[in-house]
């Protein structure tokens, strides 16, 4: 059990029959009454968010989440199949639990948050290298400063890239924001 005053962003707890991660935390001291804790939680299974208010003495059930290295194998309908690199066990993970699912290519490694032997969240590396499959030609006179154009990557994701990027080039993409970082 964990006291609500010990909650911090990233803390994972079990409440209301589900697994939740604290994303925001605020401790409020009231004049004559006791202190309150207002926390925003994200459901690890559905992605839904909820804001809850607790009295400072309340407790929640904390959970142990293990982080393991997983390898992306292949897509299967609305799921993505990953393999644990230690045990070679395979898991079909719903796309809703995969952060930046559009940037995964076969053979790529990622970190999986595991609870009771099952992945609850899969996170890709911060920066991935992907090949540009299609992009319109960049015309220099179209912009006043900089300029960008859409580019379709080998995974099907579309990102904005500078005008000088051509089809066939390998670029680096930030998986948190989906932005172009540079050439590989």
Swiss-Prot record:
GO cellular component terms, semicolon-separated: cytoplasm
Domain of life: Bacteria
Keywords, sorted A to Z: Cytoplasm, Elongation factor, Protein biosynthesis
Keyword Iron-sulfur attached: no
Statement: the UniProt record of this protein carries the keyword Protein biosynthesis: yes
Pfam families to which the protein is assigned, alphabetical: EFP, EFP_N, Elong-fact-P_C
PROSITE patterns recorded: EFP
GO molecular function: translation elongation factor activity
Subcellular location: Cytoplasm
Biological or metabolic pathway of the protein: Protein biosynthesis; polypeptide chain elongation
GO terms of biological process kind: peptide biosynthetic process
Family: Belongs to the elongation factor P family.
Database matches in PANTHER family: ELONGATION FACTOR P (PTHR30053), ELONGATION FACTOR P (EF-P) FAMILY PROTEIN (PTHR30053:SF12)
Function: Involved in peptide bond synthesis. Stimulates efficient translation and peptide-bond synthesis on native or reconstituted 70S ribosomes in vitro. Probably functions indirectly by altering the affinity of the ribosome for aminoacyl-tRNA, thus increasing their reactivity as acceptors for peptidyl transferase.
Name recorded for this polypeptide: Elongation factor P
Provenance organism: Thermus thermophilus (strain ATCC 27634 / DSM 579 / HB8)
């Amino acid at each position: 059990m964990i006291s609500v005053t010990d909650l911090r962003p990233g803390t994972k707890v079990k409440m209301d029959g589900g697994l939740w991660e604290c994303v925001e935390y605020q401790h409020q001291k009231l004049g004559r009454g006791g202190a309150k804790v207002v926390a925003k939680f994200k459901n690890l299974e559905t992605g839904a968010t909820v804001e809850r208010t607790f009295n400072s003495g309340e407790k929640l059930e904390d959970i142990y989440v293990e982080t393991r290295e997983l390898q992306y194998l292949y897509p299967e309908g609305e799921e993505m199949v990953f393999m644990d690199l230690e045990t070679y066990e395979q898991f079909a993970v719903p796309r809703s639990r995969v952060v930046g699912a559009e940037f995964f290519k076969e053979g790529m490694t990622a970190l999986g948050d595991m609870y009771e032997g099952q992945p609850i969240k899969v996170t890709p590396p911060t920066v991935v290298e992907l090949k540009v499959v299609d992009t319109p030609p960049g015309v220099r006179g179209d912009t006043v400063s900089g300029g960008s154009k859409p580019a379709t990557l080998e995974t099907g994701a579309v990102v904005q890239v500078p005008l000088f990027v051509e089809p066939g080039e390998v670029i680096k993409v930030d998986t948190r924001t989906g932005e172009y970082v540079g050439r590989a």
